[in-house]
Amino acid sequence: MIMIFGIPIQAFLGQLLIGLINGSFYAMLSLGLAIIFGMLRVINFAHGAQYMMGAFAGMLLLTWFGVNYWLALILAPVIVGITGIIVERFALRRLYNLDHLYGLLFTFGLALVIEGTFRYFYGSSGQPYATPKLLSGGVNLGFMYLPIYRGWVVIASMIVCIGTWLLIEKTRLGAYLRAATENPILVQSFGINVPLLLTLTYGLGSGLAALAGIMAAPIYQVSPLMGSNLIIVVFAIVVVGGMGSIMGAIVTGYALGIIEGLTKVFYPEASNIVIFVIMALVLLVRPAGLFGRDA
């Protein structure tokens, strides 16, 4: 039997793959969070609640209207994105010129309200969401049995992350968004509707969280607590990558997911804290994060 640092290679590769799967969700959630902070300078504590809303939207669309997974994969992010647009338009926009603390407190309170509402109606226990038939079954890789759905999650996550990065960094719309963040008055003087851009940006970030939520539903079950259990880890990932850095959020999300998975092989007791240890070390050496820009 082949060993790596005293660990059977099957266990090593298995946890490597599981870490990549978890990293796919970390990357998507970190991406939405980084977009909102990078463009709006808002620390969005409601991101975990929006992730949970995406999962519930998919489940309720199936339960109430018989909407299948593939259609819900489109509708759930749109629904949650629209709720994000409403929140930004009528509440969050009023806080932009104030200290960041106000936005953080507002979104933290919003997260508590959303989570409390869903807990009141659906309880705290998880509810199953069936894997679509097209993605049921699995593949024997030799070192582990990989469910096809989890392989799909990794591929879909990479496509979404790369596509979003290209949208922000390589398109005219992305250039407008970045310029509006740096100098909104100048951009508005060219006839560009900056408030609308900011509203759509928050809607995009919310929609990305919801997309991650519905993709996670068949794996982790649907629960009002699923977002609150994850959001602190995602914030740590964004800090390590660099607050507001799109590429930093993506790369760090995948990397720390893999590191967390491998830690479960070599030192399982530390697997729940390894991301926070890395965050502390990075902040000591590079306070702006690995991909962030120094102030």
Model regions and ranges:
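Single transmembrane alpha-helix segments in multi-pass membrane proteins
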Residues: 11-64, 86, 90-98, 102, ...
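Helix-loop-helix "hairpin" substructures at the membrane interface of multi-pass membrane proteins
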Residues: 22, 144-222, 246-252
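Transmembrane alpha-helical segments in multi-pass inner-membrane proteins
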Residues: 26, 66-78, 199-209, 213-214, ...
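Hydrophobic core segments of alpha-helical transmembrane domains in multi-pass membrane transport
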Residues: 55, 59, 77-83, 110-118, ...
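Alpha-helical transmembrane segments within multi-pass membrane transporters and channels
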Residues: 66-110, 117, 251-256, 286-287
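Cytosolic-side transmembrane-helix boundaries in multi-pass membrane proteins
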Residues: 2, 11, 90, 121, ...
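Transmembrane helix-bundle core of multi-pass membrane transporters
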Residues: 2-5, 94-95, 99-170, 197, ...
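Membrane-interfacial amphipathic/re-entrant helices at transmembrane-helix boundaries
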Residues: 1-28, 57, 68-72, 98-102, ...
